[in-house]
């Protein structure tokens, strides 16, 4: 028991140190995402095809399954797919290019964030609300729920960097 606990504590401390070392770049990325992804959600609600919604529903289900298994790498993969599929369905080529650059910069952030299973659990309901708004074609709600979701991501980041609030 004590050996496992000390390994977990060491892993948590390494995660906190990584977040602190990268805090400014991560906050920059979160701010850019919070400017662009609510717009992408609005545009998807207005422009999406039925196959876009089916794909997003499938991705969300895979995300939930990965959270239930506490598989951080798969959670990160499907979180990225969830957000990227929304951006792609916006049909806005500049948003798609910027999203690609942002995804590359936050890949490590996603993987480290989802090692803390509470962060993954915290994403299920916001993703479900975004999906439901998109399925209803409600652009205002899709934009609102995406903005709220990314505000929580920012709060999780601040919690991890400022308070060292991480438990693996």
Predicted feature residues:
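C-terminal effector-binding regulatory domain of bacterial HTH transcription factors
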Residues: 139-168
């Amino acid at each position: 028991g004590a050996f496992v606990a000390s390994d977990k504590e060491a892993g948590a401390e390494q995660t906190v140190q990584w977040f602190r070392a990268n805090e400014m770049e991560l906050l920059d990325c979160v701010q850019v995402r919070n400017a662009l992804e609510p717009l992408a959600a609005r545009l998807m609600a207005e422009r999406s095809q039925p196959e876009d919604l089916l794909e997003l529903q499938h991705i969300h289900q895979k995300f939930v399954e990965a959270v239930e298994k506490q598989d951080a790498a798969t959670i990160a993969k499907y979180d990225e797919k969830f957000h990227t599929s929304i951006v792609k369905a916006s049909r806005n080529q500049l948003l798609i290019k910027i999203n690609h650059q942002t995804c590359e910069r936050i890949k490590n952030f996603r993987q480290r964030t989802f090692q803390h299973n509470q962060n993954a659990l915290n994403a299920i309901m916001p993703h479900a609300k975004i999906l439901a708004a998109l399925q209803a074609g409600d652009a205002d709600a899709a934009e609102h729920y995406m903005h709220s979701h990314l505000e929580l991501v920012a709060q999780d980041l601040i919690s991890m960097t400022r308070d060292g609030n991480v438990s693996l």
